[in-house]
Amino acid sequence: MTLNKTDRIVITLGKQIVHGKYVPGSPLPAEAELCEEFATSRNIIREVFRSLMAKRLIEMKRYRGAFVAPRNQWNYLDTDVLQWVLENDYDPRLISAMSEVRNLVEPAIARWAAERATSSDLAQIESALNEMIANNQDREAFNEADIRYHEAVLQSVHNPVLQQLSIAISSLQRAVFERTWMGDEANMPQTLQEHKALFDAIRHQDGDAAEQAALTMIASSTRRLKEIT
């Protein structure tokens, strides 16, 4: 995907914040300095600030400019923020927090999917699974299929309130998948088997097996995340 100038500056400044060049509570350079540094206009820098505010990485203070927000206010459900944090430093507390959220949400989704999935839902899940199998050596295509797989499982629950959380859930999953993809023979067959086990449990309307399959999947990805972080 081609990034425009605004996106590139957002990534640069976002990483600088997360990686500690600008610490929480400290000011970012003034607009004029950033315009000179990135050879761009004030309008572009203001767009960048809006994007960083949406990620809750900065706060704007009247007449004073942009300041780095406290770390506990950062939007960890933003895929970019989570990726930048994970690539910068191993934080066992963050890994634990991510696992807690997934363990809380995904097994329940799996159980409800087993109870409620229609034939059309099953076809969507199976289609995504087949794409994962077909693209198991293509990191980007595999991860996109993996996200579609989990989104299809979530959609099969038919809970409109839960579906409103799908963006947040998918952001968390996407950040994890981007870091834990392993195409080697020691990991990929297990990953595919775990996804097939969940699909089979949903297809057979076995809520207990679906819940256990989700827990197994989370445990595996958490293990891989700890190994590489």
Swiss-Prot record:
Activity regulation text: D-galactonate binds DgoR and induces a conformational change in the protein, which decreases its affinity for DNA and consequently derepresses transcription of the dgoRKADT operon.
Record Gene3D superfamilies: GntR ligand-binding domain-like (1.20.120.530), Winged helix-like DNA-binding domain superfamily/Winged helix DNA-binding domain (1.10.10.10)
Disulfide links within the chain: none
Annotated effect of mutating residue 195 to A: Shows a decreased binding to both DNA and D-galactonate
Mutagenesis or variant effect for residue 146 to A: Shows increased DNA binding but can be slightly reverted in the presence of D-galactonate. Strong decrease in binding to D-galactonate
Outcome recorded upon mutating residue 46 to A: Loss of DNA-binding ability and repressor activity
Annotated consequence of substituting residue 106 to K: Completely non-responsive to D-galactonate. Does not affect binding affinity for the dgo operator
Observed effect of gene inactivation: Deletion of the gene leads to faster growth of E.coli in D-galactonate and results in a considerable increase in the expression of dgo genes.
InterPro entries recorded: GntR_C, TF_FadR/GntR_C, Tscrpt_reg_HTH_GntR, WH-like_DNA-bd_sf, WH_DNA-bd_sf
DNA-binding feature ranges: 31-50
Phenotype for residue 102 to A: Shows a decreased binding to both DNA and D-galactonate
Domain HTH gntR-type: 1-71
Phenotype for residue 7 to A: Loss of DNA-binding ability and repressor activity
Effect ascribed to mutating residue 221 to L: Decreases sensitivity to D-galactonate. Does not affect binding affinity for the dgo operator
Subunit structure: Homodimer.
Known function: Involved in the regulation of D-galactonate metabolism. Represses the expression of the dgoRKADT operon by binding to two closely spaced inverted repeats in the cis-acting element, which overlap with the D-galactonate responsive dgo promoter. Employs a derepression mechanism using D-galactonate as a specific effector molecule.
Protein's recorded name: Galactonate operon transcriptional repressor
Source organism of the structure: Escherichia coli (strain K12)
